[in-house]
Amino acid sequence: MGKVILVTGVSRGIGKSIVDVLFSLDKDTVVYGVARSEAPLKKLKEKYGDRFFYVVGDITEDSVLKQLVNAAVKGHGKIDSLVANAGVLEPVQNVNEIDVNAWKKLYDINFFSIVSLVGIALPELKKTNGNVVFVSSDACNMYFSSWGAYGSSKAALNHFAMTLANEERQVKAIAVAPGIVDTDMQVNIRENVGPSSMSAEQLKMFRGLKENNQLLDSSVPATVYAKLALHGIPDGVNGQYLSYNDPALADFMP
Protein backbone atom coordinates (compact mmCIF):
# COMPACT_ATOMS: atom_id res chain seq x y z
CA MET A 1 0.00 0.00 0.00
CA GLY A 2 1.15 3.53 -0.75
CA LYS A 3 1.25 6.47 1.61
CA VAL A 4 -1.98 7.71 3.18
CA ILE A 5 -1.82 11.49 3.52
CA LEU A 6 -4.22 14.02 5.04
CA VAL A 7 -4.32 17.49 3.45
CA THR A 8 -6.43 20.42 4.65
CA GLY A 9 -7.72 23.24 2.46
CA VAL A 10 -7.62 21.23 -0.77
CA SER A 11 -10.33 23.06 -2.71
CA ARG A 12 -8.01 25.61 -4.33
CA GLY A 13 -4.59 27.23 -4.43
CA ILE A 14 -1.64 25.53 -2.79
CA GLY A 15 -3.80 22.83 -1.22
CA LYS A 16 -5.21 21.68 -4.54
CA SER A 17 -1.73 21.78 -6.06
CA ILE A 18 -0.40 19.60 -3.24
CA VAL A 19 -3.01 16.96 -4.13
CA ASP A 20 -2.15 17.14 -7.83
CA VAL A 21 1.59 16.89 -7.17
CA LEU A 22 1.20 13.99 -4.74
CA PHE A 23 -0.60 11.95 -7.37
CA SER A 24 1.88 12.90 -10.08
CA LEU A 25 4.77 11.72 -7.91
CA ASP A 26 3.33 8.44 -6.64
CA LYS A 27 0.53 6.47 -8.27
CA ASP A 28 -0.09 4.48 -5.07
CA THR A 29 -0.63 7.48 -2.79
CA VAL A 30 -4.05 7.97 -1.21
CA VAL A 31 -5.17 11.44 -0.10
CA TYR A 32 -7.90 12.36 2.34
CA GLY A 33 -8.78 16.02 1.95
CA VAL A 34 -11.01 18.48 3.74
CA ALA A 35 -12.47 21.84 2.73
CA ARG A 36 -15.66 23.84 3.22
CA SER A 37 -16.73 23.84 -0.43
CA GLU A 38 -17.84 20.51 -1.87
CA ALA A 39 -17.89 21.36 -5.58
CA PRO A 40 -14.07 21.48 -5.98
CA LEU A 41 -13.78 18.31 -3.91
CA LYS A 42 -16.16 16.51 -6.24
CA LYS A 43 -13.99 17.54 -9.19
CA LEU A 44 -10.91 16.09 -7.50
CA LYS A 45 -12.84 12.90 -6.78
CA GLU A 46 -13.94 12.66 -10.41
CA LYS A 47 -10.35 13.17 -11.56
CA TYR A 48 -8.60 10.79 -9.18
CA GLY A 49 -11.28 8.24 -8.28
CA ASP A 50 -10.39 5.82 -5.50
CA ARG A 51 -7.12 7.62 -4.78
CA PHE A 52 -8.89 10.69 -3.34
CA PHE A 53 -11.43 10.85 -0.52
CA TYR A 54 -12.84 13.91 1.16
CA VAL A 55 -14.77 15.40 4.05
CA VAL A 56 -16.78 18.60 3.69
CA GLY A 57 -16.83 20.87 6.69
CA ASP A 58 -15.41 23.60 8.88
CA ILE A 59 -12.00 22.63 10.24
CA THR A 60 -12.62 24.65 13.40
CA GLU A 61 -15.10 21.94 14.42
CA ASP A 62 -13.50 18.93 16.07
CA SER A 63 -16.25 16.68 14.71
CA VAL A 64 -15.07 17.43 11.16
CA LEU A 65 -11.44 16.74 12.05
CA LYS A 66 -12.37 13.46 13.74
CA GLN A 67 -14.39 12.50 10.69
CA LEU A 68 -11.34 13.09 8.48
CA VAL A 69 -9.00 11.02 10.65
CA ASN A 70 -11.54 8.24 11.17
CA ALA A 71 -12.24 8.05 7.44
CA ALA A 72 -8.56 7.51 6.66
CA VAL A 73 -8.08 4.88 9.36
CA LYS A 74 -11.28 3.03 8.45
CA GLY A 75 -10.64 3.25 4.73
CA HIS A 76 -6.91 2.52 4.55
CA GLY A 77 -5.82 1.54 8.04
CA LYS A 78 -3.20 4.20 8.66
CA ILE A 79 -2.04 7.81 8.34
CA ASP A 80 1.51 8.43 7.13
CA SER A 81 1.56 12.22 6.87
CA LEU A 82 -0.49 15.32 7.52
CA VAL A 83 -0.14 18.53 5.50
CA ALA A 84 -1.78 21.44 7.34
CA ASN A 85 -2.47 23.94 4.57
CA ALA A 86 -5.82 25.59 5.30
CA GLY A 87 -5.61 29.23 6.37
CA VAL A 88 -7.07 32.70 5.95
CA LEU A 89 -5.54 36.17 5.65
CA GLU A 90 -8.26 38.36 7.09
CA PRO A 91 -8.72 40.38 9.24
CA VAL A 92 -6.25 42.78 7.66
CA GLN A 93 -6.35 45.78 9.99
CA ASN A 94 -4.12 48.33 11.63
CA VAL A 95 -3.49 48.00 15.37
CA ASN A 96 -5.64 51.10 15.90
CA GLU A 97 -8.62 49.24 14.44
CA ILE A 98 -8.22 45.84 16.07
CA ASP A 99 -11.29 43.63 16.27
CA VAL A 100 -10.29 40.98 18.78
CA ASN A 101 -13.13 38.66 17.82
CA ALA A 102 -11.95 38.72 14.21
CA TRP A 103 -8.43 37.85 15.37
CA LYS A 104 -9.83 34.96 17.42
CA LYS A 105 -11.71 33.65 14.38
CA LEU A 106 -8.51 33.74 12.32
CA TYR A 107 -6.58 31.95 15.06
CA ASP A 108 -9.27 29.28 15.25
CA ILE A 109 -8.66 28.53 11.56
CA ASN A 110 -4.93 29.17 11.19
CA PHE A 111 -3.72 27.75 14.48
CA PHE A 112 -6.12 26.09 16.89
CA SER A 113 -7.76 23.87 14.26
CA ILE A 114 -4.29 22.59 13.34
CA VAL A 115 -3.34 21.96 16.97
CA SER A 116 -6.59 20.04 17.36
CA LEU A 117 -6.08 18.00 14.18
CA VAL A 118 -2.56 17.06 15.20
CA GLY A 119 -3.84 15.94 18.58
CA ILE A 120 -6.54 13.80 17.00
CA ALA A 121 -4.24 12.28 14.37
CA LEU A 122 -1.18 11.84 16.60
CA PRO A 123 -1.92 8.27 17.80
CA GLU A 124 -2.09 7.13 14.16
CA LEU A 125 0.94 9.17 13.09
CA LYS A 126 3.00 7.59 15.87
CA LYS A 127 2.21 4.13 14.53
CA THR A 128 3.76 5.01 11.16
CA ASN A 129 6.57 7.28 12.43
CA GLY A 130 4.71 9.91 10.44
CA ASN A 131 5.30 13.46 9.32
CA VAL A 132 3.45 16.72 9.90
CA VAL A 133 4.10 19.47 7.37
CA PHE A 134 2.82 22.94 8.26
CA VAL A 135 2.26 25.56 5.56
CA SER A 136 3.71 28.70 7.15
CA SER A 137 4.44 32.15 5.70
CA ASP A 138 7.23 34.70 5.38
CA ALA A 139 4.83 36.98 7.27
CA CYS A 140 5.71 35.10 10.47
CA ASN A 141 8.89 37.14 10.87
CA MET A 142 8.50 39.95 8.31
CA TYR A 143 6.29 43.02 8.64
CA PHE A 144 3.46 43.36 6.16
CA SER A 145 1.13 46.30 6.62
CA SER A 146 -1.91 45.38 8.77
CA TRP A 147 -1.12 41.65 8.73
CA GLY A 148 -0.70 41.34 12.49
CA ALA A 149 -3.27 38.59 12.92
CA TYR A 150 -2.07 36.47 10.01
CA GLY A 151 1.65 36.86 10.68
CA SER A 152 1.41 36.13 14.37
CA SER A 153 -0.72 33.03 13.74
CA LYS A 154 1.99 31.67 11.45
CA ALA A 155 4.65 32.44 14.06
CA ALA A 156 2.61 30.42 16.54
CA LEU A 157 2.43 27.59 14.02
CA ASN A 158 6.22 27.58 13.65
CA HIS A 159 6.63 27.25 17.39
CA PHE A 160 4.12 24.42 17.46
CA ALA A 161 6.16 22.58 14.82
CA MET A 162 9.23 22.92 17.03
CA THR A 163 7.27 21.78 20.07
CA LEU A 164 5.83 18.75 18.29
CA ALA A 165 9.23 17.67 16.99
CA ASN A 166 10.80 17.89 20.44
CA GLU A 167 8.00 16.37 22.49
CA GLU A 168 6.98 13.51 20.20
CA ARG A 169 10.04 11.68 18.94
CA GLN A 170 8.07 9.19 16.86
CA VAL A 171 6.73 11.95 14.62
CA LYS A 172 8.64 14.57 12.64
CA ALA A 173 7.38 18.10 11.99
CA ILE A 174 8.41 21.08 9.88
CA ALA A 175 6.96 24.49 9.02
CA VAL A 176 7.68 25.72 5.50
CA ALA A 177 6.89 29.11 3.95
CA PRO A 178 5.70 28.83 0.33
CA GLY A 179 6.99 32.16 -0.97
CA ILE A 180 4.65 34.60 -2.71
CA VAL A 181 2.34 32.43 -4.79
CA ASP A 182 -0.10 33.28 -7.57
CA THR A 183 -3.33 32.31 -5.76
CA ASP A 184 -6.72 33.79 -4.89
CA MET A 185 -5.15 35.24 -1.75
CA GLN A 186 -2.93 37.44 -3.90
CA VAL A 187 -5.96 38.60 -5.90
CA ASN A 188 -7.65 39.53 -2.63
CA ILE A 189 -4.56 41.48 -1.55
CA ARG A 190 -4.32 43.43 -4.81
CA GLU A 191 -8.03 44.15 -5.23
CA ASN A 192 -9.63 44.23 -1.78
CA VAL A 193 -7.71 44.23 1.49
CA GLY A 194 -4.68 45.97 0.00
CA PRO A 195 -6.49 49.11 -1.18
CA SER A 196 -8.63 49.27 1.95
CA SER A 197 -6.15 48.43 4.70
CA MET A 198 -2.51 48.24 3.58
CA SER A 199 0.08 50.93 2.98
CA ALA A 200 0.34 52.31 -0.55
CA GLU A 201 3.97 51.22 -0.69
CA GLN A 202 3.25 47.58 0.09
CA LEU A 203 0.19 47.47 -2.16
CA LYS A 204 2.40 48.72 -5.00
CA MET A 205 4.90 45.97 -4.21
CA PHE A 206 2.28 43.21 -4.42
CA ARG A 207 0.80 44.61 -7.62
CA GLY A 208 4.27 44.87 -9.11
CA LEU A 209 4.97 41.22 -8.41
CA LYS A 210 1.96 40.27 -10.51
CA GLU A 211 2.67 42.77 -13.28
CA ASN A 212 6.27 41.58 -13.55
CA ASN A 213 5.36 37.88 -13.49
CA GLN A 214 7.29 37.34 -10.26
CA LEU A 215 4.64 35.33 -8.43
CA LEU A 216 5.33 31.63 -8.01
CA ASP A 217 3.15 29.00 -9.60
CA SER A 218 1.52 27.07 -6.77
CA SER A 219 3.04 23.82 -8.03
CA VAL A 220 6.52 24.98 -6.95
CA PRO A 221 5.99 25.08 -3.17
CA ALA A 222 3.39 22.31 -3.49
CA THR A 223 6.14 20.02 -4.74
CA VAL A 224 8.19 20.70 -1.62
CA TYR A 225 5.24 19.95 0.66
CA ALA A 226 4.30 16.84 -1.30
CA LYS A 227 7.82 15.41 -1.30
CA LEU A 228 8.21 16.02 2.44
CA ALA A 229 4.93 14.19 3.04
CA LEU A 230 5.88 11.32 0.74
CA HIS A 231 9.55 10.83 1.53
CA GLY A 232 9.67 12.06 5.11
CA ILE A 233 11.18 15.02 6.91
CA PRO A 234 14.98 14.71 7.26
CA ASP A 235 16.35 14.63 10.80
CA GLY A 236 18.42 17.73 10.12
CA VAL A 237 15.39 19.95 9.57
CA ASN A 238 12.99 18.33 12.03
CA GLY A 239 11.22 21.01 14.07
CA GLN A 240 12.50 23.90 11.97
CA TYR A 241 10.87 26.76 10.11
CA LEU A 242 12.31 27.17 6.60
CA SER A 243 11.47 28.82 3.32
CA TYR A 244 10.47 26.47 0.49
CA ASN A 245 13.73 27.30 -1.35
CA ASP A 246 16.08 26.93 1.59
CA PRO A 247 19.22 24.99 0.58
CA ALA A 248 18.37 22.41 3.24
CA LEU A 249 15.28 21.53 1.16
CA ALA A 250 17.04 21.40 -2.21
CA ASP A 251 16.25 17.70 -2.63
CA PHE A 252 12.53 18.47 -2.32
CA MET A 253 12.35 21.18 -4.96
CA PRO A 254 10.80 20.53 -8.41
Curated annotation (Swiss-Prot):
InterPro entries in UniProt: NAD(P)-bd_dom_sf, Sc_DH/Rdtase_CS, SDR_fam
UniProt keyword terms in alphabetical order: NADP, Oxidoreductase
Residues annotated to bind NADP(+): 7, 85, 150, 154, 181, 183
UniProt name for this protein: Uncharacterized oxidoreductase YIR035C
Highest taxon in the source lineage: Eukaryota
Other remarks in the entry: Present with 2370 molecules/cell in log phase SD medium.
Any Pfam family hit: adh_short
Active site annotation, chain numbering: 136, 150, 154
Gene Ontology CC entries for this record: cytoplasm
EC number of the protein: 1.-.-.-
Gene3D superfamilies (UniProt xref): NAD(P)-binding Rossmann-like Domain
Keyword rRNA processing in annotation: no
Family that this chain belongs to: Belongs to the short-chain dehydrogenases/reductases (SDR) family.
UniProt KW Cell division keyword: no
CDD domains xref list: SPR-like_SDR_c
GO molecular function: benzil reductase [(S)-benzoin-forming] activity; oxidoreductase activity, acting on NAD(P)H, oxygen as acceptor
Coiled-coil segments: none
